[in-house]
């Protein structure tokens, strides 16, 4: 290792050039990285919702919906607005029915706009922008609107958040570092690692908006301590060698094992996300683990050369080091052990019992004030699609629709059989299309039918009027109506599957919504003979909710076992490794309890990510203290060892943890996107809890179990 360290230090100029080229290439890669906003892409391969969405796209093409509402339109303007919206490019259809409370209520006019492009396409965004630019008084909601808010917030929020986070981290480093120059060197080195990680994301098919948003800041927070560990070792070696090159060579050679060991726990914890069924875990796990690895490579290959090159500047800018005496605190902790330990055990036990009571969110990522106002005016309009085989008996479909319409929580049911497939009498048809009733009756008699569907009548009327003089205007009206009917029919009847749209009077997620969706699915399973699929936000949320506890428990078990094995192998102590894992896992439970008691709804990925990051990253704080304690116990009694060990550890623990908390708290407070904000806030909270547990509880447990805690296999006494 020393030979390799010599090459890294002495050939530093070549390494600088290599990194400069790599950063330029990765800067290009950053702008070519594809960001995915469609969370349905991360559904498991065997997901019923995923399969249903694929079938719906194949059968009916891509489409998306925008709800548009206006206040105070008169009757003439209401119909004009429908025509104006229909005239917008890429608008497939607009549904608005005058005098129907679903669309017109208390002076509010609601239009359901269908766009002939998927939710995340440029064409859908163009339609939304056109509506907003043309009508300042329009209220808009829907998936297209949510996606627009999301992309706009990332563009607007991230630069501000990054700037403030960097300022916060510089302040922390200026306070805790021994030189005014060190923070700039540390941040520069990690900045290169972040650029490499973000640039190499271009080689991935895409990364999620969540990964893109938090990746850089989490990489910064999770790997800054590697720089500090190498710098501390360099300061020790400089006391032994006159040459700063020799000092760095030895510092690097001696730092590889502890720094690598520290990073391995973090990487293993993050890679546990890869084993989630919901593929957002793979996305975040791979990118974040890659980021920590990139940081590790930069610390080992770039930082040594930079430190040697700027050694004089570092020495000239030396300042008084902040000392945090912990000997007295540790004495107090051991004296109050009979109170602290039982209290902590009670809190952890209570947290474990209530860990499943946390309110988990899966879908809502924004508070859209327009959507809230529309729902206040018209109640919830939560649309769910049922795809069923087109050879299902009409009676089965009719009975299912009848069952749906009897429910109090159903706004409407739209199927071909109860819309375009409905047969009308001559009088009804005449009123619908502006014919004389006698004309309509004559057409019915000539066709030999007592009733007709809209499509049948349009076809019959068009063929009969072809040879009638002065009927061009009427034929043009019939042709336009026929095109509209054909277009709407194509959106309901597919080659293999038909589409039924059910509007529920529930929010998109929550116990009531998921329960209602479950009842709809169960009833369809009983009635329909062929394969069928439900598609919609609530269906996706229910599917995620059904598997969440299993997913969280699996990831928890995997991280605990994996980290326990890694700690044992690097630490060579079974009992103390078990204590470390137990303390950090207790921190996770306490963090969850704080969320439960606060009453907040937290995004599901936040809970899983907190488990992986706390277990993978903050356990390093415990490893550092325990290693120092075992070393001190070789020359002193346990009372003295506990104080000295914490004195040696606390500065590194605080520096690393405050940076992670600073990054996450800044993002949590300033990010308008809910899922990202909740995730980062929870990581910040969890890290703070972990620090308290490591600084006050872990030393007490190690102290009380001294003989077992200091036992290491494979080493002589």
Task: Write out the residue ranges for each language-model feature.
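Membrane-embedded transmembrane helical bundles of large multi-pass transporters/channels
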Residues: 1-35, 119-361, 527-717
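Acidic-histidine catalytic/liganding microenvironments
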Residues: 11, 85-91, 135, 336, ...
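Juxtamembrane segments of multi-pass membrane proteins
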Residues: 39-68, 73-77, 337-463
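Extracytoplasmic
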Residues: 50, 54, 76-80, 84-175, ...
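Short secondary-structure junctions
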Residues: 90-97, 411-414, 601, 634
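Active-site lining segments that contact anionic ligands and/or coordinate catalytic metals
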Residues: 381-383, 410, 487, 494-499, ...
């Amino acid at each position: 290792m020393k030979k390799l360290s010599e090459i890294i230090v002495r050939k530093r100029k070549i390494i600088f050039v290599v990194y400069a080229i790599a950063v330029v290439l990765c800067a290009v890669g950053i702008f070519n990285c594809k960001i995915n906003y469609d969370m349905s892409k991360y559904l498991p391969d065997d997901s019923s919702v995923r399969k249903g969405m694929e079938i719906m796209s194949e059968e009916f093409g891509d489409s998306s919906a925008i709800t548009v509402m206006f206040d105070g339109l008169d009757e003439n303007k209401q119909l004009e607005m429908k025509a104006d919206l229909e005239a917008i490019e890429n608008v497939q259809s607009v549904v608005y029915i005058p005098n129907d409370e679903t669309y017109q209520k208390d002076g509010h006019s609601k239009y359901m706009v269908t766009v002939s492009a998927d939710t995340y396409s440029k064409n859908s965004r163009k339609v939304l922008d056109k509506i907003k630019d043309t009508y300042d008084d329009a209220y808009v909601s829907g998936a297209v609107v949510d996606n627009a808010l999301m992309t706009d917030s990332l563009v607007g929020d991230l630069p501000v958040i990054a700037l403030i986070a960097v300022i916060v981290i510089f302040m922390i480093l200026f306070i805790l570092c021994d030189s005014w120059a060190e923070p700039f060197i540390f941040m520069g080195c990690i900045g290169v690692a972040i650029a490499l990680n973000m640039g190499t994301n271009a080689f991935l098919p895409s990364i999620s908006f969540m990964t893109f948003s938090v990746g850089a800041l989490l990489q910064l927070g999770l790997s800054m301590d590697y720089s500090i560990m190498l710098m501390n070792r360099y300061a020790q070696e400089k006391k032994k060698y006159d040459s700063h090159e020799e000092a760095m060579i030895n510092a690097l050679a001696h730092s590889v094992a502890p720094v690598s060991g520290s990073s391995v726990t973090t990487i293993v914890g993050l890679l546990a996300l890869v084993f989630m069924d919901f593929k957002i875990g793979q996305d975040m796990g791979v990118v974040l683990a890659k980021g920590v690895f990139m940081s590790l490579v930069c610390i080992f290959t770039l930082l040594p050369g930079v430190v040697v090159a700027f050694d004089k500047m570092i020495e000239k800018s030396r300042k008084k080091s902040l000392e945090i005496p912990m000997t007295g605190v540790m004495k107090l902790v051991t004296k109050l052990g009979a109170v602290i330990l039982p209290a902590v055990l009670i809190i952890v036990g209570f947290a474990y019992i209530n860990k499943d009571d946390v309110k988990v969110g899966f879908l809502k990522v924004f508070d859209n004030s327009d959507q809230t106002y529309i729902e206040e005016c018209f109640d919830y309009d939560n649309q769910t699609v049922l795809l069923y085989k087109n050879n299902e008996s009409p009676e089965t479909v009719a009975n299912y629709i009848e069952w749906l319409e009897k429910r109090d929580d159903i706004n409407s049911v739209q199927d071909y059989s109860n819309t375009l497939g409905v047969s009308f009498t001559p009088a009804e048809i005449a009123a619908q299309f502006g014919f004389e009733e006698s004309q309509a009756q004559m057409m019915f008699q000539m066709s030999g039918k007592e009733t007709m569907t809209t499509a049948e009548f349009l076809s019959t009327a068009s063929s009969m009027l072809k040879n009638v003089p002065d009927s061009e205007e009427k034929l043009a009206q019939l042709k336009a109506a026929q095109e509209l009917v054909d277009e709407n029919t194509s959106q309901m009847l597919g080659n293999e599957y038909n589409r039924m749209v059910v509007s529920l009077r529930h929010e998109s997620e929550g116990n009531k919504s998921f329960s209602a969706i479950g009842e709809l699915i169960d009833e369809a399973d009983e009635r329909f003979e062929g394969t069928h699929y439900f598609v919609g936000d609530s269906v996706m949320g229910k599917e995620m909710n059904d598997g969440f506890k299993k997913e969280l428990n699996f990831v928890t078990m995997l991280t605990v076992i994996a980290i326990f094995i890694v700690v044992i192998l690097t630490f060579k102590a079974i009992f103390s490794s078990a204590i470390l894992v137990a303390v950090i896992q207790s921190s996770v439970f306490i963090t969850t309890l704080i969320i439960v008691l606060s009453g907040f709804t937290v995004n599901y990925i936040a809970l899983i990510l907190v488990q992986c990051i706390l277990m993978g990253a903050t356990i390093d704080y415990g490893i550092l203290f325990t290693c120092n304690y075992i070393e001190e116990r070789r020359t002193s009694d346990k009372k003295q060892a506990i104080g000295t060990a914490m004195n040696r550890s606390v500065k590194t623990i605080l520096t690393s943890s405050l940076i992670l908390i600073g990054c996450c708290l800044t993002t949590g407070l300033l990010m308008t996107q809910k899922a990202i904000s909740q995730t980062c806030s929870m990581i910040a909270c969890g890290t703070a809890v972990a620090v308290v547990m490591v600084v006050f509880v872990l030393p007490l447990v190690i102290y009380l179990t001294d003989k077992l805690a200091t036992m290491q296999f494979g080493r002589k006494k």
